[in-house]
UniProtKB/Swiss-Prot annotation:
Taxonomic placement: Archaea, Thermoproteota, Thermoprotei, Sulfolobales, Sulfolobaceae
HAMAP family: Ribosomal_eL15
Protein name, UniProt field: Large ribosomal subunit protein eL15
Coiled coil: none
Native source species: Saccharolobus islandicus (strain L.S.2.15 / Lassen #1)
A molecular-function term among this protein's GO annotations: structural constituent of ribosome
PANTHER family for the chain: LARGE RIBOSOMAL SUBUNIT PROTEIN EL15, RIBOSOMAL PROTEIN L15
Length: 216
């Protein structure tokens, strides 16, 4: 079987030589650029094509840079131990890909987000490329595969969590696979009942429940 060019693009992108050589040099250049940059063509053509990108008028590729790490929570000035200060270990409820899509949509309010894909990350930032479509462009209007973006129900779809990254952050994909089935829920509840029964049968539970002296 003859392999397509996208197969070789993916293998090249996943190779360690590419990551340590070309991609690392690109990260150095991307840090000097603005956080939102419009591109002439996608960096990962195989991922862009799999998400619906076409090399035609009306399609725009935007690279967005998002800061890595958790939230910068303010450190309280009242007394408590450092573990309970609530400064470290807290991240955003949204995914970084969804945040990147929203920033691109605010930068280009006349475009709609079709999808996005991961490009890479360094020590400070994560980089995503956003596929955006102009629903008012004549080429898009006459394309039966993309004219659904003109529907008012799809306006500002990224801000309503209708993109792939938004649905994932909203938890709409948890039912896919074994974890969302009734059998999995039943087995999980059965495991909780067994753990509770085992705990109640322990000596610590009996002493804690019956050996307490009232008023002390």
């Amino acid at each position: 079987m003859t392999l397509s060019v996208y197969h070789y693009i993916e293998n090249t992108w996943n190779s360690e030589e590419w990551k340590k050589g070309v991609l690392r040099q690109r990260f150095i250049e991307w840090r000097k650029e603005p956080s939102i940059v419009r591109l002439a063509k996608p960096t990962r053509l195989n991922r862009a094509r799999s998400l619906g990108y076409k090399a035609k008028q009306g399609f725009v590729i935007v690279r967005v840079r998002v800061r890595r790490g958790g939230l910068n929570k303010p450190r309280p000035n009242k007394g408590r131990r450092p573990k309970r200060m609530g400064v470290y270990g807290y991240g955003p409820a949204k995914g970084y890909k969804w945040i990147a899509e929203e920033r691109a949509a605010r930068k280009y309010p006349n475009l709609e987000v079709l999808g996005s894909y991961y490009v890479g990350e360094d020590g400070l930032y994560k980089y995503y490329e956003i596929i955006m479509v102009d629903p008012s462009h004549p080429v898009i209007k006459n394309d039966p595969n993309y004219k659904w973006l003109q529907d008012p129900s799809n306006r500002n779809r990224v801000f309503r969590g209708l993109t792939s990254a938004g649905k994932k952050a909203r938890g709409l994909r948890k039912s896919k696979g074994f974890k969302g089935t009734v059998k999995h829920k039943w087995s999980r509840k059965q495991k909780e009942r067994e753990e509770k029964k085992r705990h109640e049968a322990s000596k610590y539970y009996r002493l804690q429940r019956y050996d307490k002296i009232p008023g002390k």
